[in-house]
């Protein structure tokens, strides 16, 4: 599989250590956190599943059959990796109060467990989660000491908040199709396909901007015209507040943001605008797709700082525990630590 991110910069240089990722399903564990309580009643049955070696779409389709409903009646907040052990909620539109008998479904699929159920008044929609908790094992690590040094840096500075390879499809196909659609002015009623390509387009331009800041030693430097996050507030950096905002950033109170391109003007100014505009201009096909679909500009933090990061060493294995907000990629953490060893998975 092609690494679409291969050309992008690293925070501390490309890792020298190698390791296997997801050598076993239990080496990549994910627990979804929706961040809200269910109402306890309503037309939607909420089903907490634990799946091993299965993808979310497959489980949702099979759960729909078990409940006697159509696939479109089962929804989720986020897609979870197949090569892993993952816990997440699925919602099933079942207006009747009875909970189906899942015994035949569970007997057919021993790789799927139903942990609990509840009732809610709304179905789950993509993005209806606050984040995920991870337990990741790096196995057969070739240089444990180097990875431990890098972990100290990650704990202090975070990592580039890149969108991972998953966003760009197998071998970057979604990104290539996004460019083709923009270049050829493709119009499609396939909303899911259009959403995938638009997402790939904006994500790639964002990644280029973050990589450039790293290459220019501006990853932790506040620029004139930057947009900074302070909680839910956005601050514009001017000549008058530049020094003060850099101090607040250094103290950990502010976050530098990068562009998620839209058809409206960038809100950045001065030096920050000049840096970002280069990459919008460099991708005319992607921008044609974005503008043609009237996407509005948005912002995203350029640094990803995992919460509750800890690690332990077990021989030549390193076990990582951390939490990420929704929309962030665990692969961005791993990318800064090791080069992945290619191997044939048996699951």
UniProtKB/Swiss-Prot annotation:
GO terms for biological process, alphabetical: tRNA pseudouridine synthesis
InterPro entries for the chain: PsdUridine_synth_cat_dom_sf (IPR020103), PsdUridine_synth_TruD (IPR001656), PsdUridine_synth_TruD_CS (IPR020119), PsdUridine_synth_TruD_insert (IPR011760), TruD_catalytic (IPR042214), TruD_insert_sf (IPR043165), TruD_pseudoU_synthase (IPR050170)
Active site: 81 (nucleophile)
Heme as UniProt keyword: no
Protein's organism: Vibrio vulnificus (strain CMCP6)
Domain TRUD span(s) in chain numbering: 158-304
GO MF entries: RNA binding; tRNA pseudouridine(13) synthase activity
Pfam families: TruD
One Gene Ontology cellular component: cytosol
E.C. number(s) listed in UniProt: 5.4.99.27
Family: Belongs to the pseudouridine synthase TruD family.
Keyword field contains tRNA processing: yes
Protein's UniProt name: tRNA pseudouridine synthase D
Recorded catalytic activity of this chain's protein: uridine(13) in tRNA = pseudouridine(13) in tRNA
Function: Responsible for synthesis of pseudouridine from uracil-13 in transfer RNAs.
Transmembrane regions: none
Highest taxon of the lineage: Bacteria
Keywords: Isomerase, tRNA processing
């Amino acid at each position: 599989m092609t690494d679409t991110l291969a050309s992008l910069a690293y925070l501390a240089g490309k890792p020298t250590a190698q390791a296997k990722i997801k050598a076993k399903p239990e080496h990549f564990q994910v627990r979804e956190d929706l961040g809200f309580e269910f109402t306890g009643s309503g037309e939607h049955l909420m089903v907490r599943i634990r799946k091993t070696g299965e993808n979310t779409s497959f489980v949702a389709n099979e759960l729909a059959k078990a409940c006697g409903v159509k696939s479109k009646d089962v929804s989720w907040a986020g897609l979870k990796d197949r090569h892993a052990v993952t816990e997440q909620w699925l919602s099933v539109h079942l207006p009747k109060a009875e909970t189906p008998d899942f015994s035949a479904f569970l007997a057919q699929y021993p790789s799927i467990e139903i942990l609990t159920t509840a009732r809610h008044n709304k179905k789950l929609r993509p993005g209806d989660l606050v984040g995920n908790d991870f337990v990741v094992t790096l196995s057969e690590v070739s240089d444990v000491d180097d990875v431990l040094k890098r972990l100290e840096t990650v704990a202090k500075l975070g990592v580039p908040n890149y969108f991972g390879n998953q966003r760009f499809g197998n071998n970057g196909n979604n990104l290539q199709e996004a460019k083709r659609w923009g270049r050829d002015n493709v119009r499609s009623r396939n909303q899911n396909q259009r959403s995938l390509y638009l997402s790939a387009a904006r994500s790639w331009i964002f990644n280029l901007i973050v990589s450039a800041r790293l290459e220019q030693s501006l990853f932790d430097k506040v620029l004139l015209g930057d947009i900074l996050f302070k909680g839910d507030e956005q601050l514009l950096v001017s000549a008058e507040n530049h020094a003060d905002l850099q101090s607040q950033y250094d103290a950990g109170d502010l976050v530098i943001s990068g562009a998620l391109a839209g058809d409206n003007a960038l809100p950045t100014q001065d030096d920050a605008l000049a840096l970002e505009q280069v990459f919008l201009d460099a991708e005319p096909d992607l921008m044609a797709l974005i503008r043609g679909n009237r996407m509005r500009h948005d912002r995203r933090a350029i640094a990803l700082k995992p919460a509750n990061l800890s690690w332990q060493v077990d021989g030549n294995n390193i076990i990582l525990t951390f939490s990420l907000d929704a929309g962030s990629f665990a692969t961005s953490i791993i990318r800064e630590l090791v080069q992945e060893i290619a191997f044939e998975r048996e699951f």
